Amino acid sequence: MAATPIRVIVSALVILSVLLLSSSLGVATETEIERNETEVRLMYEQWLVENRKNYNGLGEKERRFKIFKDNLKFVDEHNSVPDRTFEVGLTRFADLTNEEFRAIYLRKKMERTKDSVKTERYLYKEGDVLPDEVDWRANGAVVSVKDQGNCGSCWAFSAVGAVEGINQITTGELISLSEQELVDCDRGFVNAGCDGGIMNYAFEFIMKNGGIETDQDYPYNANDLGLCNADKNNNTRVVTIDGYEDVPRDDEKSLKKAVAHQPVSVAIEASSQAFQLYKSGVMTGTCGISLDHGVVVVGYGSTSGEDYWIIRNSWGLNWGDSGYVKLQRNIDDPFGKCGIAMMPSYPTKSSFPSSFDLLSEI
Protein backbone atom coordinates (compact mmCIF):
# COMPACT_ATOMS: atom_id res chain seq x y z
CA MET A 1 0.00 0.00 0.00
CA ALA A 2 1.48 3.33 -1.00
CA ALA A 3 2.18 5.83 1.75
CA THR A 4 -0.14 8.81 1.85
CA PRO A 5 1.37 12.29 1.52
CA ILE A 6 0.47 12.99 5.15
CA ARG A 7 2.35 9.88 6.37
CA VAL A 8 5.37 10.85 4.30
CA ILE A 9 5.38 14.33 5.80
CA VAL A 10 5.00 12.99 9.35
CA SER A 11 7.81 10.47 8.83
CA ALA A 12 10.07 13.17 7.44
CA LEU A 13 9.35 15.42 10.43
CA VAL A 14 10.11 12.59 12.85
CA ILE A 15 13.42 11.84 11.12
CA LEU A 16 14.31 15.54 11.07
CA SER A 17 13.50 15.86 14.78
CA VAL A 18 15.71 12.89 15.62
CA LEU A 19 18.57 14.33 13.58
CA LEU A 20 18.23 17.74 15.23
CA LEU A 21 18.10 16.16 18.70
CA SER A 22 21.16 14.05 17.97
CA SER A 23 22.98 17.11 16.68
CA SER A 24 22.13 19.17 19.76
CA LEU A 25 23.16 16.36 22.06
CA GLY A 26 26.41 16.07 20.19
CA VAL A 27 27.13 19.76 20.67
CA ALA A 28 26.31 19.55 24.37
CA THR A 29 28.61 16.59 24.79
CA GLU A 30 31.44 18.46 23.13
CA THR A 31 31.24 21.28 25.70
CA GLU A 32 31.07 18.95 28.68
CA ILE A 33 34.26 18.18 30.59
CA GLU A 34 34.59 14.46 31.14
CA ARG A 35 36.83 13.48 34.07
CA ASN A 36 37.48 9.90 35.12
CA GLU A 37 37.73 8.82 38.74
CA THR A 38 41.52 8.56 38.67
CA GLU A 39 41.94 12.13 37.41
CA VAL A 40 39.55 13.52 40.01
CA ARG A 41 41.23 11.52 42.76
CA LEU A 42 44.62 12.96 41.80
CA MET A 43 43.18 16.47 41.79
CA TYR A 44 41.74 15.84 45.25
CA GLU A 45 45.03 14.58 46.66
CA GLN A 46 46.87 17.59 45.25
CA TRP A 47 44.23 19.91 46.70
CA LEU A 48 44.61 18.26 50.12
CA VAL A 49 48.34 18.97 50.09
CA GLU A 50 47.97 22.55 48.88
CA ASN A 51 45.38 23.32 51.55
CA ARG A 52 47.04 21.29 54.32
CA LYS A 53 43.95 19.21 54.93
CA ASN A 54 44.06 16.18 57.18
CA TYR A 55 40.84 14.44 58.18
CA ASN A 56 40.74 12.46 61.40
CA GLY A 57 37.22 11.04 61.42
CA LEU A 58 36.55 7.53 60.11
CA GLY A 59 35.37 7.80 56.52
CA GLU A 60 35.64 11.59 56.57
CA LYS A 61 38.17 11.75 53.74
CA GLU A 62 35.86 9.82 51.42
CA ARG A 63 32.85 11.89 52.45
CA ARG A 64 34.78 15.06 51.67
CA PHE A 65 35.88 13.56 48.35
CA LYS A 66 32.25 13.23 47.26
CA ILE A 67 31.63 16.88 48.14
CA PHE A 68 34.83 17.83 46.31
CA LYS A 69 33.55 16.06 43.18
CA ASP A 70 30.25 17.93 43.36
CA ASN A 71 32.06 21.25 43.64
CA LEU A 72 34.40 20.31 40.79
CA LYS A 73 31.36 19.61 38.62
CA PHE A 74 30.01 23.07 39.46
CA VAL A 75 33.39 24.60 38.58
CA ASP A 76 33.61 22.80 35.24
CA GLU A 77 30.04 23.67 34.28
CA HIS A 78 30.43 27.33 35.22
CA ASN A 79 33.76 27.85 33.48
CA SER A 80 32.64 26.07 30.29
CA VAL A 81 29.99 28.71 29.59
CA PRO A 82 31.31 31.24 27.05
CA ASP A 83 31.68 34.94 27.90
CA ARG A 84 31.68 34.57 31.66
CA THR A 85 33.13 37.63 33.39
CA PHE A 86 34.58 35.55 36.23
CA GLU A 87 35.91 32.09 36.93
CA VAL A 88 35.36 29.77 39.86
CA GLY A 89 37.82 27.16 41.06
CA LEU A 90 38.88 24.71 43.74
CA THR A 91 39.31 27.20 46.55
CA ARG A 92 40.06 26.29 50.17
CA PHE A 93 36.31 25.64 50.55
CA ALA A 94 36.09 22.96 47.84
CA ASP A 95 35.47 20.20 50.42
CA LEU A 96 32.48 21.97 51.97
CA THR A 97 28.85 21.90 50.93
CA ASN A 98 27.37 25.35 50.50
CA GLU A 99 25.34 24.79 53.66
CA GLU A 100 28.50 23.99 55.65
CA PHE A 101 30.31 26.97 54.17
CA ARG A 102 27.53 29.35 55.18
CA ALA A 103 27.27 27.88 58.67
CA ILE A 104 31.01 28.16 59.39
CA TYR A 105 32.10 31.36 57.66
CA LEU A 106 28.98 33.50 57.43
CA ARG A 107 26.70 34.70 60.15
CA LYS A 108 23.17 35.92 60.68
CA LYS A 109 22.04 38.91 58.67
CA MET A 110 24.11 41.99 59.45
CA GLU A 111 22.00 45.08 60.03
CA ARG A 112 22.89 48.66 60.81
CA THR A 113 21.90 48.84 64.48
CA LYS A 114 24.26 51.70 65.31
CA ASP A 115 24.35 54.82 63.16
CA SER A 116 27.31 57.15 63.27
CA VAL A 117 27.33 60.92 63.33
CA LYS A 118 25.44 62.24 60.31
CA THR A 119 27.81 63.75 57.77
CA GLU A 120 27.99 64.71 54.13
CA ARG A 121 31.75 64.28 53.94
CA TYR A 122 31.51 61.77 51.11
CA LEU A 123 28.05 62.58 49.76
CA TYR A 124 28.37 62.59 45.99
CA LYS A 125 27.41 65.90 44.42
CA GLU A 126 26.96 66.81 40.79
CA GLY A 127 30.23 68.20 39.54
CA ASP A 128 32.44 66.01 41.73
CA VAL A 129 35.38 64.74 39.72
CA LEU A 130 36.60 61.35 40.90
CA PRO A 131 39.52 59.24 39.64
CA ASP A 132 38.59 56.55 37.13
CA GLU A 133 40.44 54.00 39.23
CA VAL A 134 41.86 53.76 42.74
CA ASP A 135 43.90 51.00 44.37
CA TRP A 136 45.02 51.61 47.95
CA ARG A 137 47.30 48.58 47.73
CA ALA A 138 49.46 50.48 45.25
CA ASN A 139 49.53 53.43 47.66
CA GLY A 140 50.80 51.25 50.51
CA ALA A 141 47.67 51.53 52.65
CA VAL A 142 46.61 47.87 52.72
CA VAL A 143 48.09 45.14 54.91
CA SER A 144 48.52 41.73 53.25
CA VAL A 145 45.53 39.37 53.19
CA LYS A 146 44.70 37.77 56.54
CA ASP A 147 42.78 34.62 57.48
CA GLN A 148 39.93 34.61 59.98
CA GLY A 149 39.98 30.81 60.21
CA ASN A 150 36.89 28.92 61.39
CA CYS A 151 35.67 31.95 63.31
CA GLY A 152 32.89 34.35 62.35
CA SER A 153 35.07 37.38 63.00
CA CYS A 154 34.80 38.98 59.56
CA TRP A 155 33.44 42.15 61.21
CA ALA A 156 36.72 42.57 63.11
CA PHE A 157 38.84 42.08 59.97
CA SER A 158 36.71 44.55 58.04
CA ALA A 159 36.95 47.22 60.74
CA VAL A 160 40.66 46.69 61.36
CA GLY A 161 41.39 46.83 57.62
CA ALA A 162 39.72 50.23 57.39
CA VAL A 163 41.61 51.49 60.46
CA GLU A 164 44.94 50.22 59.10
CA GLY A 165 44.20 52.12 55.90
CA ILE A 166 43.29 55.49 57.39
CA ASN A 167 46.21 55.27 59.80
CA GLN A 168 48.65 54.77 56.94
CA ILE A 169 47.10 57.61 54.95
CA THR A 170 47.38 60.06 57.84
CA THR A 171 50.71 58.97 59.35
CA GLY A 172 52.57 57.23 56.54
CA GLU A 173 52.95 54.07 58.65
CA LEU A 174 51.34 50.78 57.62
CA ILE A 175 50.83 48.79 60.83
CA SER A 176 49.07 45.41 61.07
CA LEU A 177 46.56 45.70 63.90
CA SER A 178 44.89 43.18 66.21
CA GLU A 179 41.60 41.59 65.22
CA GLN A 180 41.93 39.30 68.23
CA GLU A 181 41.70 42.26 70.61
CA LEU A 182 38.28 43.04 69.13
CA VAL A 183 37.22 39.38 69.26
CA ASP A 184 38.24 39.08 72.93
CA CYS A 185 37.47 42.50 74.34
CA ASP A 186 34.69 44.07 72.26
CA ARG A 187 31.85 42.16 73.84
CA GLY A 188 28.55 43.89 74.12
CA PHE A 189 25.05 44.25 72.77
CA VAL A 190 25.93 43.19 69.22
CA ASN A 191 29.57 42.17 68.82
CA ALA A 192 30.11 38.59 69.93
CA GLY A 193 33.54 37.39 68.87
CA CYS A 194 33.33 34.40 66.54
CA ASP A 195 29.55 34.65 66.48
CA GLY A 196 29.54 37.85 64.47
CA GLY A 197 29.45 41.58 64.93
CA ILE A 198 29.08 44.99 63.31
CA MET A 199 31.91 47.23 62.15
CA ASN A 200 30.53 50.45 63.67
CA TYR A 201 30.58 48.88 67.13
CA ALA A 202 34.20 47.89 66.53
CA PHE A 203 35.06 51.49 65.66
CA GLU A 204 33.24 52.62 68.81
CA PHE A 205 35.26 50.19 70.92
CA ILE A 206 38.56 51.39 69.45
CA MET A 207 37.61 54.98 70.28
CA LYS A 208 36.56 54.25 73.87
CA ASN A 209 39.49 51.90 74.40
CA GLY A 210 41.94 54.65 73.51
CA GLY A 211 43.17 52.78 70.45
CA ILE A 212 44.03 49.27 69.33
CA GLU A 213 47.10 47.04 69.69
CA THR A 214 49.28 45.65 66.95
CA ASP A 215 48.72 42.16 65.65
CA GLN A 216 52.22 41.31 66.86
CA ASP A 217 51.45 42.32 70.46
CA TYR A 218 47.97 40.74 70.50
CA PRO A 219 48.12 38.00 67.80
CA TYR A 220 45.15 36.34 66.18
CA ASN A 221 44.26 32.77 67.18
CA ALA A 222 40.73 32.33 65.77
CA ASN A 223 39.50 31.33 69.23
CA ASP A 224 36.56 32.81 71.06
CA LEU A 225 36.80 32.22 74.80
CA GLY A 226 35.20 35.53 75.70
CA LEU A 227 38.24 36.47 77.80
CA CYS A 228 39.95 39.79 77.22
CA ASN A 229 43.69 39.62 77.83
CA ALA A 230 43.96 42.48 80.31
CA ASP A 231 47.76 42.60 80.20
CA LYS A 232 47.83 43.03 76.44
CA ASN A 233 44.78 45.28 76.39
CA ASN A 234 46.42 47.63 78.89
CA ASN A 235 49.57 48.11 76.82
CA THR A 236 50.20 51.44 75.16
CA ARG A 237 47.71 51.77 72.32
CA VAL A 238 49.53 51.94 69.02
CA VAL A 239 46.83 53.29 66.71
CA THR A 240 43.90 55.57 67.53
CA ILE A 241 41.00 56.99 65.53
CA ASP A 242 39.00 60.17 66.03
CA GLY A 243 35.61 58.72 65.18
CA TYR A 244 33.65 56.95 62.48
CA GLU A 245 31.01 57.86 59.93
CA ASP A 246 28.58 56.18 57.56
CA VAL A 247 28.77 56.61 53.82
CA PRO A 248 25.36 57.79 52.52
CA ARG A 249 23.60 54.47 52.13
CA ASP A 250 22.28 52.94 48.92
CA ASP A 251 24.44 55.23 46.78
CA GLU A 252 27.35 53.72 44.84
CA LYS A 253 28.54 57.15 43.71
CA SER A 254 28.99 58.24 47.32
CA LEU A 255 30.72 54.95 48.09
CA LYS A 256 33.06 55.60 45.16
CA LYS A 257 33.84 59.04 46.56
CA ALA A 258 34.60 57.54 49.97
CA VAL A 259 36.85 54.81 48.55
CA ALA A 260 38.71 57.45 46.53
CA HIS A 261 39.79 58.89 49.89
CA GLN A 262 40.30 55.78 52.04
CA PRO A 263 39.51 52.05 52.44
CA VAL A 264 35.90 51.52 53.55
CA SER A 265 34.22 48.79 55.61
CA VAL A 266 31.19 47.22 53.93
CA ALA A 267 28.86 44.27 54.41
CA ILE A 268 27.81 42.01 51.54
CA GLU A 269 25.89 38.82 50.89
CA ALA A 270 28.52 36.15 50.27
CA SER A 271 26.47 32.96 50.55
CA SER A 272 26.33 31.73 46.95
CA GLN A 273 28.26 28.72 45.74
CA ALA A 274 29.86 30.94 43.11
CA PHE A 275 31.21 33.24 45.83
CA GLN A 276 32.38 30.24 47.86
CA LEU A 277 34.41 29.06 44.87
CA TYR A 278 35.25 32.44 43.29
CA LYS A 279 38.69 32.50 41.68
CA SER A 280 39.17 35.51 39.41
CA GLY A 281 37.52 38.11 37.19
CA VAL A 282 34.61 40.48 37.84
CA MET A 283 31.99 38.79 40.01
CA THR A 284 28.68 39.33 38.22
CA GLY A 285 26.84 36.27 39.48
CA THR A 286 23.49 36.29 41.20
CA CYS A 287 23.45 37.42 44.82
CA GLY A 288 20.94 39.04 47.14
CA ILE A 289 21.05 41.65 49.87
CA SER A 290 20.92 39.50 53.01
CA LEU A 291 24.17 40.91 54.37
CA ASP A 292 26.17 38.16 56.07
CA HIS A 293 29.85 39.03 55.63
CA GLY A 294 32.07 42.01 56.44
CA VAL A 295 34.92 42.99 54.10
CA VAL A 296 36.90 46.11 53.20
CA VAL A 297 36.79 47.95 49.86
CA VAL A 298 40.32 49.04 48.92
CA GLY A 299 39.73 50.42 45.45
CA TYR A 300 37.77 50.33 42.23
CA GLY A 301 38.35 50.19 38.49
CA SER A 302 37.09 48.88 35.15
CA THR A 303 38.07 46.14 32.73
CA SER A 304 36.54 45.12 29.39
CA GLY A 305 33.55 47.36 29.99
CA GLU A 306 32.85 46.00 33.48
CA ASP A 307 33.15 48.34 36.46
CA TYR A 308 34.21 46.71 39.71
CA TRP A 309 35.08 47.21 43.37
CA ILE A 310 38.37 45.81 44.71
CA ILE A 311 37.58 43.94 47.92
CA ARG A 312 40.05 42.49 50.39
CA ASN A 313 38.56 39.43 52.05
CA SER A 314 39.71 37.62 55.20
CA TRP A 315 39.73 34.03 53.94
CA GLY A 316 43.45 33.71 53.27
CA LEU A 317 45.33 33.46 49.98
CA ASN A 318 43.72 30.19 48.81
CA TRP A 319 40.43 31.87 48.03
CA GLY A 320 39.70 34.25 45.21
CA ASP A 321 42.40 36.19 43.43
CA SER A 322 45.05 35.75 46.14
CA GLY A 323 42.47 36.72 48.75
CA TYR A 324 40.74 39.48 46.76
CA VAL A 325 37.53 39.69 44.74
CA LYS A 326 36.47 42.14 42.07
CA LEU A 327 32.76 42.75 42.64
CA GLN A 328 30.60 44.28 39.92
CA ARG A 329 30.07 48.04 40.32
CA ASN A 330 27.48 50.47 38.94
CA ILE A 331 24.59 48.05 38.63
CA ASP A 332 20.99 49.14 38.19
CA ASP A 333 20.16 48.72 41.88
CA PRO A 334 20.60 51.34 44.62
CA PHE A 335 21.77 48.65 47.07
CA GLY A 336 24.72 47.74 44.84
CA LYS A 337 25.95 44.26 43.96
CA CYS A 338 25.38 41.86 46.87
CA GLY A 339 24.19 44.85 48.95
CA ILE A 340 27.61 46.54 49.02
CA ALA A 341 26.12 50.05 49.22
CA MET A 342 23.72 49.28 52.09
CA MET A 343 25.99 49.55 55.12
CA PRO A 344 29.35 51.20 54.30
CA SER A 345 31.25 53.04 57.04
CA TYR A 346 34.75 54.27 57.75
CA PRO A 347 36.92 55.48 60.63
CA THR A 348 38.07 59.09 60.77
CA LYS A 349 41.50 60.37 61.72
CA SER A 350 42.85 63.91 61.44
CA SER A 351 46.01 65.24 59.80
CA PHE A 352 45.53 64.16 56.21
CA PRO A 353 48.82 64.92 54.45
CA SER A 354 47.91 67.10 51.47
CA SER A 355 50.50 65.29 49.35
CA PHE A 356 48.74 61.98 49.94
CA ASP A 357 45.12 63.04 49.61
CA LEU A 358 43.97 61.94 46.17
CA LEU A 359 41.15 64.45 46.09
CA SER A 360 42.26 67.48 48.05
CA GLU A 361 40.05 69.77 46.01
CA ILE A 362 36.78 67.93 46.67
UniProtKB/Swiss-Prot annotation:
Active site (catalytic residues): 154, 293, 313
Residue pairs linked by disulfide bridges in the UniProt entry: 151-194, 185-228, 287-338
Keywords, in A-Z order: Disulfide bond, Glycoprotein, Hydrolase, Protease, Signal, Thiol protease, Zymogen
Glycosylation sites: 36, 234
One Gene Ontology MF term: cysteine-type peptidase activity
Top-level EC class: hydrolase
Gene3D superfamilies: Cysteine proteinases
Keyword check for Hydrolase: yes
Propeptide cleavage-removed residue intervals: 29-129
Enzyme Commission (EC) number: 3.4.22.-
Domain of life: Eukaryota
Signal peptide: 1-28
One GO-annotated biological process of the protein: proteolysis
CDD domains associated with the record: Peptidase_C1A (cd02248)
UniProt KW Glycoprotein keyword: yes
Family classification: Belongs to the peptidase C1 family.
Cited function: Probable thiol protease.
Protein name: Probable cysteine protease RDL2
Organism: Arabidopsis thaliana (Mouse-ear cress)
Gene: RDL2
